[in-house]
UniProtKB/Swiss-Prot annotation:
Gene3D superfamilies, per the entry: Aldolase class I
Protein's name according to its UniProt entry: Biotin synthase
Keyword Iron-sulfur included in the entry's annotation: yes
The keyword S-adenosyl-L-methionine is annotated on this UniProt entry: yes
Organism: Ehrlichia canis (strain Jake)
Record-listed [2Fe-2S] cluster binding positions: 101, 132, 192, 264
InterPro entries for this protein: Aldolase_TIM, BATS_dom, Biotin_synth/BioAB, Biotin_synthase, Elp3/MiaA/NifB-like_rSAM, rSAM
Catalytic activity as recorded in UniProt: (4R,5S)-dethiobiotin + (sulfur carrier)-SH + 2 reduced [2Fe-2S]-[ferredoxin] + 2 S-adenosyl-L-methionine = (sulfur carrier)-H + biotin + 2 5'-deoxyadenosine + 2 L-methionine + 2 oxidized [2Fe-2S]-[ferredoxin]
Residues annotated for [4Fe-4S] cluster binding in this entry: 57, 61, 64
Enzyme Commission number(s): 2.8.1.6
Family: Belongs to the radical SAM superfamily. Biotin synthase family.
Gene Ontology annotations of biological process type: biotin biosynthetic process
Subunit annotation: Homodimer.
Domain Radical SAM core: residue ranges: 42-269
């Protein structure tokens, strides 16, 4: 197509709610056609995620198995050694990932760990993969150091709407999250930020969450949309599963609001059929996580993902070197 839809940072809530209330077929057709204006047809970005520090997090996020506030079956582990991380990076590349993400169950980045983090970034770049870190809140000075080390992306999800947020987490504020996102942006690192569906939020909360992301100074380049995986021992262990159609519609609305962003099917794919995942990809999702585990929750098998992408005639994206 020769006519491109301009990106916007001035969305209004009533506009987004109107999209959510659009007939399903009309909505996903609109999002699909818009997706084709900005991305190669049938191309899917592949990320791999490794937990470098498991459990013992001081935050009280009610969905999380790694929170020290809840009694789950998770065993607390110390920082992974560099050699184990190197092997994980090489395995991810072998499996076809173009981005390697690493996460730690921390409230915030600690200055004493920056050298270790920068060593991980070096390992990722040495394998010609994009790098992404998810390490909690981050100051501007820390973000600048990570940028100088070659970090491509920093993940910091907002989880839900500002209104619903106190029902999810009380140990850090919504503004804390937005401050970190601003620090990441000011440091020149690409933002990865999204949310979780199935926390008990309303459609309006989903609209407000996407409104916050779409009206940032710059749209997040990656927007992970997670489906809650209920964890035994957490306050949300008995939450009802979000309706499949509602999930797909959220993907479609995210695509329309942020047409140049990679919309990622993140946690919860194990509960999705191939047909549902195919509809999500049609509606505008164009990124997935490869690997048997996402932090502490099971993920789709790599072979199953390859088979699905093959059935759909999809191809994987080549890495982009933002800090080469």
């Amino acid at each position: 197509m020769s006519t491109f839809t301009p990106t916007r940072n001035d969305w209004q809530l009533d506009e987004i709610l109107e999209l959510f209330h659009t007939a399903f077929n009309d909505l996903i057709l609109q999002s699909h056609l818009l997706h084709r204006q900005f991305f190669s047809n049938n191309e899917v970005q592949i990320s791999s995620l490794l937990n470098i520090k498991t459990g013992g997090c001081p935050e009280n996020c009610k969905y999380c198995s790694q929170s020290a506030h809840y009694k789950t079956d998770l065993k607390k582990e110390s920082l992974l050694d560099i050699e184990s991380i190197k092997k994980a990076i090489q395995t991810a590349k072998k499996n076809g990932a173009d981005r390697f993400c690493f996460a730690a169950a921390w409230r915030q980045v600690r200055d004493r760990d920056l050298e270790y983090i920068c060593d991980i970034i070096d390992l990722i770049k040495s394998e010609n993969l994009e790098s992404c870190a998810s390490l909690g809140m981050v100051t501007l000075e820390q973000a600048k150091k990570l940028k100088n080390a070659g970090l491509d992306f920093y993940n910091h999800n907002i989880d839900t709407s500002r209104d619903f947020y106190p029902n999810v987490t009380t140990t850090r504020s919504y503004d804390d999250r937005l401050t970190s996102l601003n620090n990441i942006h000011e440091a020149g690192i690409n933002i990865c930020s999204g949310g979780i569906l199935g926390l008990g939020e309303s459609v309006e909360d989903r609209a407000k969450m996407l409104l916050t992301l779409a009206n940032l100074k710059e749209h997040p380049l990656s927007v992970p949309i997670n489906r809650l995986v209920p964890i035994k021992g957490t306050p949300f262990e008995n939450n009802a599963k979000i309706d499949n159609i509602d999930f797909i519609k959220t993907i479609a609305v995210a695509r329309i609001l942020m047409p140049k962003s990679y919309i990622r099917l993140a946690a919860g794919r194990m509960s999705m059929s191939e047909e549902m995942q195919a509809l999500c990809l049609f509606a505008g999702a164009n990124s997935i996580f490869y690997g048997e585990k996402l932090l502490t929750t099971p993920n789709a098998d790599c072979n199953d993902d390859r088979n699905l992408l093959s059935k759909l005639g999809a191809k994987t994206k080549e890495p982009v070197f933002f800090n080469s």
